[in-house]
């Protein structure tokens, strides 16, 4: 990472020159709008032309923490931070989020172009990060028809169940193998992330492992570990406030090193994904495949109104990667944080265990059809989503016209960031917001649902750009936590009375991976072999 004062001064000088010329040109073409009499949302003092770029390039890292600290200092739920010619609008209020994502959904239904999203979508070929337009509409139709429909959800039930079984098998095998020891320590971060990766690979490719997996076949091998770690690397850089996102012509400098990191991670993901796609395409073209078995097959056989393939090979590869990115993050992060909080609060863990024993019993494992009756377990998941979101912001929205939000002027082209952590930890919305308390979700709801319409929690967002995989994501996360709770008794590692639940400074993951002692609590015949 470059840390040279002369280089930074040189870059800022170039930036000033370029932005001066651009602003003069912009003034010639700017239309007069009545909304321009309104003020922008409150924000920090900014430099002429370059705005607050020096702040995000300097010591205010990570930028998302600086933004939330700034909003707290300004005592505002909506702010405006100018980065070169771009107005970045963070929001930490569910009321304002509803205005943006529901009332003015059409105004904010597109996405900005960023370095990270360009890489992960292979040049904007996918549904989640693609700006509004014909390509987005096409990909949305395909994903809605072949991935997120009720029929597809049921089609993938067995694959999801197989991986929930494998999770229990993986942990139990380690317990049996080490039965002579006084305790068995499980790397829960590894377990829950690989569960999510396994489900993604099983639904997409029909496989659990790229290679042989671990020695006993239930755990990940080096290939799966690299695959999932690379997916998480891409996720943490999707909107990382890279300089090139606001000054594209400086992208060649890669000042923060973001592009190198993302390109390497995407290369690793493609190294594993693309050969499977190429092989499957060949099987369909050679007539060896007759019936679809997974999401990849569904993409390949999708046809347009003329009977021609809807998706190109490159579009298939891009959408496969995006769906994997969307599958691995929320379930694993919520489960790791949820387990850590519940191990530290045995009374909460005990209530969840008692609910599962009452609804399911102890002679079989939890299955998805049990989930509607496991409200307390689902409340634990929802509380993990609220208090410990996987990312500080949703993917950015961009305003397609000048508009007014909460009485403030929002210029066309603004990047609007709905804050998951800001809303989930907002003391005006939640009593004792930093306390893990599943009961708060049971007082007014007879049925707990992660996708909250009031947007007091931002889990799957809302509107045209809301997450399309709500059913899959919810089922995966509920099953993951339920199986961990039902199958094993969990304690901190020896010598520790509590789990360290410190949050990483650079992101919202646990600062240290979760390790805990697992002891099987069911009869041996219940565990998959």
Swiss-Prot record:
Q: In which pathway does it act?
A: Secondary metabolite biosynthesis; phenylglucosinolate biosynthesis
EC number annotated for this UniProt entry: 1.14.14.40
Provide the topology term for how it sits in the membrane.
Answer: Single-pass membrane protein
- Compartments where found: Endoplasmic reticulum membrane
Q: Biological process GO terms, please?
A: secondary metabolite biosynthetic process
Superkingdom of the organism of origin: Eukaryota
Where is this protein chiefly located?
endoplasmic reticulum
Spell out the molecular function terms from Gene Ontology: heme binding; iron ion binding; L-phenylalanine N-monooxygenase activity
- Any one of the GO CC terms: endoplasmic reticulum membrane
Q: Which cofactor does it need?
A: heme
Provide the transmembrane region boundaries: 1-21
Q: Which InterPro entries match?
A: Cyt_P450, Cyt_P450_CS, Cyt_P450_E_grp-I, Cyt_P450_sf
- Catalysed reaction per UniProt? L-phenylalanine + 2 reduced [NADPH--hemoprotein reductase] + 2 O2 = (E)-phenylacetaldehyde oxime + 2 oxidized [NADPH--hemoprotein reductase] + CO2 + 3 H2O + 2 H(+)
Write out the similarity annotation: Belongs to the cytochrome P450 family.
Function of the molecule: Converts L-phenylalanine into phenylacetaldoxime, the precursor of benzylglucosinolate (glucotropeolin).
Name this polypeptide is given: Phenylalanine N-monooxygenase
What is the native source organism of this protein?
A: Arabidopsis thaliana (Mouse-ear cress)
